[in-house]
């Protein structure tokens, strides 16, 4: 607190989070001080290493691609991941990825509310990460229930994370709060559409969903009903994408 009081400048990792910490919900008891120091408070977005996260040169993925070739080549990574994880092998399946710590902060209670709606015959879900036993077991359950559609990988691997970013059509990240977030940036780098909750750096780095042309998805998924709307869009996208 003393540092915040006497600092010449205060930074955090996104403009939206800089605004959020001025409120009681996000401020952790320091929201009054944040409001008092608002003239000195700025958000500076995190970034990723474009050389490390580069689908054109990434040695961790089966098929390299770029902005000109991704429509033809990206699906080869999907088929390879389907084979590796024992999912139904069909490049037309709409594959959603989650690479995350499995905790309440990541909004997984919202995902739990719509898992059955998401897991239609045309959708596959790949989960990578560890965390709370509740969520680890939840994804294990759905892996058992929808064995050819859900793959729960309850561990973390840098190699596997790159494969998920490269293989998936969409990346699900409905965080309760997210000062900045990096996974959505990695997904974007690999041409994988982030579906995120409108909070913190997710709001600042992912454009809102455009209902007229279907481009990008950041959505106000603060409730289960809002998440159900997202599941409808996911199912629609799985049936209409080219």
Please identify what each model-predicted range represents.
Residues 1-242:
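Catalytic cores of nucleotide-sugar-dependent glycosyltransferases that transfer UDP/GDP/TDP-activated
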């Amino acid at each position: 607190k003393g540092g915040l009081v006497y600092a010449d400048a205060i930074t955090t990792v996104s403009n939206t989070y800089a605004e959020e910490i001025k409120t009681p919900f996000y401020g952790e008891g320091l929201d009054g001080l944040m409001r008092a120091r608002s003239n000195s408070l700025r958000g500076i977005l995190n970034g990723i290493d474009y050389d490390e996260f580069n689908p054109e040169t990434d040695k961790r993925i089966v098929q390299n691609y770029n902005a000109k070739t991704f429509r033809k080549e990206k699906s080869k990574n999907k088929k390879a991941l389907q084979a590796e994880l024992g999912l139904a092998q069909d490049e037309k399946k709409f594959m959603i990825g989650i690479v995350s710590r499995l905790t309440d902060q990541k909004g997984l209670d919202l995902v739990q509310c719509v898992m059955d709606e998401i897991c239609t015959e045309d959708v596959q879900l790949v989960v990578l990460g560890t965390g709370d036993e509740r969520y680890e077991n939840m994804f294990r359950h759905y892996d058992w229930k929808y064995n050819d559609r859900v793959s729960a990988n309850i561990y973390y691997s840098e190699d596997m994370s790159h494969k998920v970013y490269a293989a998936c059509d969409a990346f699900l990240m409905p965080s309760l709060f997210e000062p900045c977030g990096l996974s959505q940036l990695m997904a974007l780098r690999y041409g994988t559409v982030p579906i995120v909750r409108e909070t913190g750096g997710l709001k600042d780095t992912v454009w809102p969903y455009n209902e007229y042309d279907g481009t990008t998805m950041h959505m106000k998924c603060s409730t289960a009903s809002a998440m159900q709307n997202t599941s409808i869009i996911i199912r629609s996208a799985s049936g209409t994408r080219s």
